């Protein structure tokens, strides 16, 4: 009986060591992958040479991965607060990283097609709220994952259009935001407020507003890239 308890205790300890998440992220060198393995252009021609996309591997730490990072070259552990905004969950963080990657791909396609004098259709859906800034008035009405689709009943066509609309306002102006949350449309009110000590810059009070959009290019571009996020590889995609 005593040996059984010891065995169970050891098993629980091992499982905790291997699987309990810690408030750290482990970063290490990732893979170098040829762009042509996941990006294709309909009717495109293959050139000589090869373009490689280099990635950084990142995972949530467990006690095991944390200890391993201390002895593995080119591997480091950082507190999750370095990557996650206040109030942002791990799922929200993953979603933000995916949107950053989507934006990188879309910007690359748009720029490449402009250089080739080809048109790209953009279906702009809104602005993704990465997280409201703690202490801001927006923190009372917005949550990570919300998508802002209109200001004072007027939609916007690009991220820059959204930013210009906000910056044209004065601190203290009340604005009505149309948002999508969990598949439902809502209307909330907040105030434009200063976002720096000088008071020269104003905003709604959210971190890193990201565009939520889809693009359609002709000839069609297919990017079959999974499990890669972040604002990376834009130059490689464009080339």
Region locations from a protein language model:
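Conserved PDZ fold ligand-binding element
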Residues: 138-160
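Aromatic-capped interface at the extracytoplasmic side
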Residues: 18-35
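Hydrophobic membrane-insertion alpha-helices, especially the h-region
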Residues: 4-22
């Amino acid at each position: 009986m005593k040996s059984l308890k010891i065995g169970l205790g050891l098993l629980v300890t091992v499982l905790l060591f291997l699987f309990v998440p810690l408030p750290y992220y482990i970063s290490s060198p990732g893979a170098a992958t040829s762009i042509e393995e996941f990006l294709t252009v309909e009717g495109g021609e293959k050139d000589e040479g090869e373009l490689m996309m280099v990635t950084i591997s990142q995972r949530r730490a467990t006690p095991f991965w944390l200890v391993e990072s201390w002895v593995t070259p080119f591997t480091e552990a950082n507190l999750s607060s370095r990557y996650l905004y206040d109030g942002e969950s791990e799922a929200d963080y993953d979603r933000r990283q995916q949107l950053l990657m989507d934006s990188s791909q879309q910007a690359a396609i748009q720029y490449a097609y402009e250089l080739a004098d080809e048109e790209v259709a953009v279906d702009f859906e809104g602005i993704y709220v990465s997280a409201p800034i703690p202490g801001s008035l927006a923190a009372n009405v917005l949550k990570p994952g919300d998508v802002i689709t209109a200001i004072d009943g007027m939609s916007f066509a690009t991220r820059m259009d959204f930013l210009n609309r906000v910056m044209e306002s004065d601190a203290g102006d009340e604005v009505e935001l149309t948002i999508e949350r969990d598949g439902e449309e809502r209307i909330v009110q907040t105030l434009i407020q200063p976002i720096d000590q000088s008071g020269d810059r104003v905003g709604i009070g959210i971190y890193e507003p990201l565009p939520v959009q889809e693009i359609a290019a002709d000839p069609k571009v297919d990017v079959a890239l999974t499990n890669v996020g972040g604002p990376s590889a834009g130059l490689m995609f464009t080339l």
